[in-house]
Amino acid sequence: FFITVRGILELLLPNYMAKLLGEAMKDKTETSINGIGDFFKLFNSSEWQPIFITAGIMLVIIIFIIILTILSRYFESKVASGFAMELRREVYKKVESFSLDEMDYFTVSSLITRTTNDIQQLQGYVNFILGFLFLQPIMAIGAIVMAIRINASLSLVLTVSLVSLLIILITIFVIILPYFAKMQKLMDKMNLVTRENLTGLRVVRAHNTQKYQEEKIDKVNLETKKINIFVGRTAGFLWPTLGLVLGLTSLAIMFFGANHINFEARTGLNPEELLLLQQYSSRAIMSLMFITMIFIMIPRANVSANRIMEVLDLEPRIKEESNPVNLEFEKVRGEVVFNDVTFKYMDADEAVIKNISFKAEAGKTTAFIGSTGSGKSTLINLIPRFYDATEGEILIDNIPINKLSFNSLYSLIGYVPQQGILFSGTIRDNIAFGKNSNVETIEKSAEIAQGKEFIESFNDKYDSNISQGGTNVSGGQRQRLSIARAINK
């Protein structure tokens, strides 16, 4: 509504501008203004009053256009931001349901790019399209109709200009279209290399391979730079082309229009109408330019949308049963049984573990010993269904784990990863990890994990800050805090 009214008002404005010019060109009595009284006398005179009234109407229209622009921008931003927020939430929820197979398929760096850069691209496009897709067609069609009404023969100049501009814009559009997908893939690669370099910074320094890592980043950087320069250089023709077409159109209208004014009796064209025709021609060309910009943005937005939909449309391999079993924690014994379990990774030729059978009895400790790559970690990852067994079954208290609800299964497991993973926040936050645990429970968990001593050596004890990834504590301390978190669960 705001956009439609704004478009109509902007189309009305040139009419009043031409009317103001017509009134100003009329012969008037020579008048001097020596004070405010003379100004009011001038305002009330029959010669000058139409000029003041027309100028006043123009001022009111401009104020309304400004108000409507502010309101429309507010709602556009609100809709675009809400869209991006919901999309991020849906993508995050979907990623949470992925098994490690799906995580390996997409890679963490690619998922980060999709949930940040790609959604940001779509947000910007939605914001842009809301502001221009509805307004500019109204402006373009309205300006062309008004130009034809003023003088149909001179409007042919506008038609030729619009067709020429459209051909140029489509040519540029076709040239740069394939490069948008390449840019997004390079963004994934850039995130991957940067993430590897930053997370492995200590290893890089210890091996004195800074130059080697810099060369890897520079290679991706150079590819990105080349594509950005090409796209920027090609798209850079748009605005100069627009300026050229606008200038030539105005020149042609003025040239042919002046000839028509010389024969006013035949054509009925006057200077005000010539100005009006020039104004509407400029508005039509500008509107076409903005409409084309929308279509030029489509490929980049389409690439981002496809990448996001690839995440949202992927069906997780590991699913919950339609009527899952919910076990009560207090009634669970905790017996885990593997019956002839075989597992191989997605797209792998060989199985990592084959025909494994054992029973981990409740209340007893079961340990796995084997060489590197023998499948110890893989076997453990099958219990919380980070992966699903290719063959055989795994049971908890004689119930197959694929029959259990995810909430029930996860509530039974205290998981401590090989590499201690901590989150930004305090030590207390990391041990409690979303649970409303009291101080005594948190401290008891830390004590059992043999982490109480080093925690209490910190100035703020349990309120000490942990940086992202736990980089401000040692590897052993991270492991103790991870164990405490699992115990507290």
Regions found by a protein language model. Give the residues of each.
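Alpha-helical segments in transporter systems
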Residues: 1-19, 54, 58, 73-77, ...
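An intracellular "coupling" helix at the cytosolic face of ABC transporter transmembrane type-1 domains
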Residues: 97-101, 117-126, 130, 134, ...
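Juxtamembrane helix-loop junctions of ABC transporter transmembrane domains
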Residues: 9-25, 52, 57-108, 112, ...
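Helix-loop junctions and hydrophobic alpha-helical segments within the transmembrane domains
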Residues: 91, 95, 204, 308, ...
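Helix-loop-helix
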Residues: 146-160, 173, 230-307, 311-312
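Transmembrane helices of ABC transporter permease
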Residues: 1-7, 58-65, 128-183, 254-269
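Transmembrane helix-loop-helix hairpins at lipid-water interfaces of multipass membrane proteins
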Residues: 1-68, 148-153, 262-271
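ABC-type nucleotide-binding domain
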Residues: 329-489
